[in-house]
Amino acid sequence: MCMVIFAPLFAMFAFATCGGYSGGLRLSVDCVNKTESNLSIDIAFAYPFRLQQVTFEVPTCEGKEQQKLALVGDSSSSAEFFVTVAVFAFLYSLAATVVYIFFQNKYRENNRGPLIDFIVTVVFSFLWLVGSSAWAKGLSDVKVATDPKEVLLLMSACKQPSNKCMAVHSPVMSSLNTSVVFGFLNFILWAGNIWFVFKETGWHSSGQRYLSDPMEKHSSSYNQGRYNQESYGSSGGYSQQANLGPTSDEFGQQPSGPTSFNNQI
């Protein structure tokens, strides 16, 4: 039930917070010659974070010439992989929810549904772990590449002490941090569901039968042995009691009375 409710929501939050991100930073370069200054240099970037394609122009403080620069790094592979896993997990969760609710008999027919569900759950657990870890590393690279201090180091005008370079505002990464959190939450959710899906497969029930059969055989043989011992003891006891009574052959017949007394009279 938890998978039916939380799996689609967690997957949706994961790809929405990452795939829908767009942010930016603003820098200012104050040259000695004020006419050459630019106090509002906006640098925008977004998913899939191909930062090397993000270009911007800054003053050189050496006349009207502008310097064209680009950000450093490319985290598109990890970001796209993460979003792809989230989208497919979302779609599968919705499809599985429909099957659970409306096609329960078809799901359990020939045990095919639980087996497929178990395999897919294991695969998605692994993909969530790999995708979340890769995206966490990719996000760390994005933060470094878009750090205003790092970007200012790329400008030739900022290497001259007479010019003043500063960051007006930094990019907001809260939604990207949330995407990483939801990625690992999805891994915990899917990995924790492996055991519950496994119990619905035939492998779990067959394993229990395999373990219970030897125990039943051992218990039946033990009870049979006890029954034989009790039967043997009881039969022996009765035979001994039967042999304790005297027989007519051993003691003979008792005399009926003295016959010689009648003869004397």
Curated annotation (Swiss-Prot):
Cytoplasmic topological segments: 1-4, 103-114, 199-265
Membrane topology (UniProt): Multi-pass membrane protein
Residue ranges of the region described as 5 X approximate repeats: 210-242
Record field: transmembrane: 5-25, 82-102, 115-135, 178-198
Keywords: Cytoplasmic vesicle, Glycoprotein, Membrane, Phosphoprotein, Repeat, Synapse, Synaptosome, Transmembrane, Transmembrane helix
Positions annotated with a glycan in the UniProt record: N33, N38
Any one GO cellular component localisation term in the record: synaptic vesicle membrane
Chief localisation class: membrane
Short name of one Pfam family: MARVEL
Stretches for region Disordered: 221-265
Ranges of Polar residues composition bias in the record: 221-230, 240-265
Phosphoserine: residues bearing it: S212
Residue ranges annotated for the MARVEL domain, each copy included: 1-202
Sequence repeats: 210-214, 222-226, 227-231, 232-236, 238-242
Family recorded in the similarity comment: Belongs to the synaptophysin/synaptobrevin family.
Physiological role: Intrinsic membrane protein of small synaptic vesicles. Probable vesicular channel protein.
The protein's name in its UniProt record: Synaptoporin
